């Protein structure tokens, strides 16, 4: 298994689906074999993949349509399906062992399990799930057991918050904390005021408002780090930027620590066990500096502040699209070795 490429299929070619495809196609240890999306043609799929307003044009190899069921990335053929019902997608025939479920629709265990009927061996849901086990790379992926066929990669915000919370809790202990994420626009929002029965504020124009919103990201940290269960909660502000978000974690510490000691601990971890997952910067950065950053969480040492040795506000950036999509692939690689 070690030298063989891991074969992956993607269901749903939206923001995350397309970026997961970009991540896969730039790596040597994984291979994209199939994409399913019932709502777009292969021609349109090519266009959407090739041109990206945030991450720029695809420049790694030529992409063309071979026929209505096949895309060519350079010489590499990728099978295209347009099937609505997940259990009818012939993943097995396409050779896909892992399926990335990125439609945003089939996020619970039973719905995602439909992919197994078509021959997939494992499914990774690229969203939080109410009942599938959630894994955050760098935090709890070592708890994955090979008999788990359906897992969730949690949310982009949980992937940013959990590594930071883990370091702080391991080193200083968290009594309790509140998180705010200042979060870029996502596809569920509206370009102008429109109907949104479940979330009235969420129906207001995305490019013109700061919109308070709920997020389960902080509570989900309690699922991946049980020792923090019930100690964290949070909310979100949706703001008119297209990508990159930032977590503000305000915590009460068990063990008194100066802000410099906290910085030192985070810096150490960012160069050690969490290298590539948790970053550390003392530069005067702003959000666009993190477009295309593949780390889950980049701690901004200059932006945080301490009120006392037991009460601090910590700030950490994340490319909520690219960083998260990279983790989806990392989780698959980890699962394949289990």
From Swiss-Prot:
One of its GO terms (biological process) is glucose metabolic process. Keywords: Cytoplasm, Glycolysis, NAD, Oxidoreductase, S-nitrosylation. Its EC number is 1.2.1.12. Residues 56-75 are annotated as: External loop. Pfam families: Gp_dh_C, Gp_dh_N. Transmembrane segments: none annotated. The active site is at residue 156. GO terms for molecular function: glyceraldehyde-3-phosphate dehydrogenase (NAD+) (phosphorylating) activity; NAD binding; NADP binding. It comes from the Eukaryota. CDD domains: GAPDH_I_C (cd18126), GAPDH_I_N (cd05214). Residues 154-338 are annotated as: Catalytic. It is an enzyme of class 1 (oxidoreductase). It is found in: Cytoplasm. Residues 183-206 are annotated as: S-loop. It catalyses: D-glyceraldehyde 3-phosphate + phosphate + NAD(+) = (2R)-3-phospho-glyceroyl phosphate + NADH + H(+). Belongs to the glyceraldehyde-3-phosphate dehydrogenase family. Plants contain two types of GAPDH: cytosolic forms which participate in glycolysis and chloroplast forms which participate in photosynthesis. All the forms are encoded by distinct genes. This is Glyceraldehyde-3-phosphate dehydrogenase, cytosolic. It comes from Sinapis alba.
């Amino acid at each position: 298994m070690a030298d063989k490429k891991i074969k992956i299929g993607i269901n749903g070619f939206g923001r995350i689906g397309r970026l997961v495809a970009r991540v896969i196609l730039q790596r040597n240890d994984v291979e994209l074999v199939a994409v399913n999306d019932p709502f777009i043609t292969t021609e349109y799929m090519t266009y959407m993949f090739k041109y990206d307003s945030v991450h720029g044009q695809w420049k790694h190899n030529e992409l063309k349509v071979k026929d209505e069921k096949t895309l060519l990335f350079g010489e590499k053929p990728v099978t295209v399906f347009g099937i609505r019902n997940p259990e009818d997608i012939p993943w097995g025939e396409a050779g896909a062992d892992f399926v990335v479920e990125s439609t945003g629709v089939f996020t619970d265990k039973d719905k995602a399990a439909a992919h197994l009927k078509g021959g997939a061996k494992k499914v990774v849901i690229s969203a939080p799930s109410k009942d599938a086990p959630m894994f955050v790379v760098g935090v709890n992926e070592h708890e994955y057991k090979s008999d788990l066929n359906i897992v969730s990669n949690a949310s982009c915000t949980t992937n940013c918050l959990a590594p930071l919370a883990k370091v702080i809790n391991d080193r200083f202990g968290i009594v309790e904390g509140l998180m705010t994420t200042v979060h870029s626009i996502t596809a569920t929002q509206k370009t102008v005021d429109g109907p949104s029965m479940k979330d009235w504020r969420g129906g207001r124009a995305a490019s013109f408002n700061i919109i308070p919103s709920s997020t389960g990201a902080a509570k989900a940290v309690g699922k991946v780090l049980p020792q923090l269960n019930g100690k964290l909660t949070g909310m979100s502000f949706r703001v008119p930027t297209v990508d990159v978000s930032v977590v503000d974690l305000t915590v009460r510490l068990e063990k008194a620590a100066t802000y410099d000691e906290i910085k030192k601990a985070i810096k150490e971890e960012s160069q050690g066990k969490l290298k590539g997952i948790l970053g550390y910067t003392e530069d005067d950065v702003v959000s666009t500096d993190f477009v295309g950053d593949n780390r889950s969480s980049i701690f901004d040492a200059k932006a945080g502040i301490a009120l006392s040795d037991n009460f601090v506000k910590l700030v950490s950036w994340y490319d909520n699209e690219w960083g998260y999509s990279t983790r989806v692939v990392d989780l698959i690689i980890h699962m394949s070795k289990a």
